[in-house]
Amino acid sequence: MPNIFKILLIVLLAVVSFRLSASTGDKKTANDGSGNNSSAGIGTKIKRIVTAGLLFTSLATGGAEAIGRSNAQGGNAAGLVPSHVTNRSMAPPPPPVQFEMGANRLEKMRAHLRELAEKMPVNESKRLSPSGPDPHHH
């Protein structure tokens, strides 16, 4: 059972990180002179968090257990040492606030992606260009 959870989580994170990297595409180096490239910074931050999550989740031996303890980014969270061996006093510190924010943002994005997937009919699963006209209207 934990393996199924682990695989699902990895796939989900991969999808989210792919969507993120696609959405920030050419904005990474864009700078209009007034230093307004902060959006790229936020995107890369989230991407880093996602990548770290992917890395630790794929390394974790007890994936679901590590997720349940929500310390997938802590010191020994890679699951290389089983939790029953680890000393309780060596528990990793609570995650920083920034990670919490990133997690919340990811949750929102996942919910949004789920809604989009539900709304999209099967026969229109081909990608439409976001700004282009809808082919069915012409």
From Swiss-Prot:
Glycosylation sites: N37, N87, N123
Signal peptide per UniProt: 1-22
Sequence segments annotated as region (Disordered): 66-97, 116-138
Gene Ontology BP, a term: cell differentiation
A cellular component annotation (GO) from this entry: host cell cytoplasm
Domain of life: Eukaryota
Keywords: Apoplast, Differentiation, Glycoprotein, Host cytoplasm, Secreted, Signal
Annotated segments matching region Required for secretion from the host cytoplasm to the host apoplasm: 23-90
Subcellular location: Secreted; Host cytoplasm; Host extracellular space; Secreted, Extracellular space, Apoplast
Expression tissues: Highly expressed exclusively within the dorsal esophageal gland cell during syncytium formation in host plants (at protein level).
Record keyword Signal present: yes
Protein's UniProt keywords contain Protein biosynthesis: no
Residue interval(s) of motif CLE: 127-138
Its job: Mimics host plant CLE extracellular signal peptides that regulate cell fate. May play a role in the differentiation or division of feeding cells (syncytia) induced in plant roots during infection.
Similarity remark: Belongs to the CLV3/ESR signal peptide family.
Protein name per Swiss-Prot or TrEMBL: CLAVATA3/ESR (CLE)-related protein 2
Lineage: Eukaryota, Metazoa, Ecdysozoa, Nematoda, Chromadorea
